[in-house]
Amino acid sequence: MNTTLITGASSGIGAAFARKLAARGRNVLLVARSEDKLIALCNELGRLTSIRAQYVALDLEQPDAAAQLFDETKKRELEIDMLINNAGFGSMGDFAKLDPNRELEMIQLNIRAVVDLTHRFLPAMRAQKRGTIINVASTAGFQAVPYMATYAATKAFVLSFSEALWDENRLHGVHVMALCPGVTETGFFDASKIERPPMRTVQTPEEVVDTALRGLARKKSVVVSGWTNWLMTEAERFVPRSLVTRVAGKALRPRFE
C-alpha cells in the first residue's frame, strides 16, 4: 500500500502535511510521541477523507527508533513512497549555559534520525524508480545564528544533505527536497519560552505546506517559504558571513544577557 510517512505529525507543519496530503487522496502513516494527538488526527482524517490513516507513537530521539519504525512499516506491509522528515526541535540561549544533554538530543533528532530514516527508505524508492523525500530544514540553516547555535547548525546539515541527495537521486526517479520555513506559528516559541516575533513575519503551517507542495510539483531542490524569507536568504549571499552573524547575534543577545 503506497503511503506517506510523516514524522513530527501530531501538530504544526507535520499535521498540516497530513491534512493536505490526505485531501489529495494519499494514505498516511503519522509518527510522533503523543499517541492521543495522533489518534485524534487519524480519526479526523478518517471522517473527512477516504484515505487510510495510521500512526506509530514513537520517540525518534531514541537511537534505535528509526530501525523500529522501519520494521513496523514492513510488518504492516506498507510501501513508503513519500517520506517527510519533519520531527525536530530547537533551543535558544547562551550555548555555554545550555543543558549539554539536551543539545545532543537535538542533534539525534534533527540530524541522526533524518539520516537514518532516509537511508532505510531510499533504496526501495530507487528500486521502484519513484519516490519523494522532503526534509524540513529552516531559514536558520542558511547562516550561523548566535544563541541558536546548535539548532541552526543542525538545519544547515539538513539543507546541505538534502541538496546533495537531490542530485544523487534525480536520475533514479526519486525527488529529494529541503523545505526551509521561517518563523512559523507552531509550539516552538512556547516551548523555548522566548518572545514571539511580530505576527506579520509569522506564517501558518498551512501556508508553509502549500509552498512546499508547489515547490514539489516544480521538482525544486530547496523551497524557502515566504517572500520575505526568500529575499533574506538570497541577500545574505552578497554580505560577508561575519556581518550576517553579528547582526543575528545583536538581535538575540539582549534576550539572554
Question: Where do the model's predicted regions map?
Answer:
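Conserved glycine-rich cofactor-binding loop
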Residues: 10-11
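Conserved NAD(P)H cofactor-binding loop of Rossmann-fold oxidoreductase domains
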Residues: 86-91
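Active-site helix of classical SDR
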Residues: 118, 154
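Residue(s) in the substrate-gating loop at a strand-loop-helix junction
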Residues: 138
